[in-house]
C-alpha cells in the first residue's frame, strides 16, 4: 500500500519548498527548501533524495516498471543496503544545476553535489562524519544521457561500516 501527501510551493520566483508524507507508514519523506537564483545553480537544504544515481532522483510516476531496479535498491539506500531501507533519502545540503541549454527542457550538462548526515530517514546522526555524494550527466545528442555518480560515507558510531558506492548510467528516450 502506498499513499502520499505532497505539498509544494513557491515563496518567491527563486525560493521554493516541498513536503512529502507517506500516509500508511506515517513517515516524513521530504522536507526541504530550495533556492534557485539561476538554472546553473541551486541550493537545497533539508530532507531529500540523495544525488546518487539518476533513477533515485526520478519520481516513481515516470518509471516503466513497478519499482526501482534491484541495482538501485542495493546502491541508493533501499532494501538490502547497509543503511537499511531509507528510500534513497537523507538530511543534508545539496547544490546543483543545469548548464548549456540545448532545447526548451534539455541541457548538455546536469550536476548535483551533496553533503548528508548519512543516517537516512532518521533525524539523529549516527556519528560525527558526513557523507558525500556527487552526480552528473551529459547529453551529447537529444534523448541520450550518460552520467556517473559516487557516494562516500561511514554508517555507524565507530566508522567501521563503509558505504562507498559508484555508478554509471545511460538513458535514451
At which residue positions do the language-model features occur?
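Outer membrane beta-barrel
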Residues: 1-121, 126-133, 137-152
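Detector for outer-membrane/organellar transmembrane beta-barrel domains
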Residues: 137-173
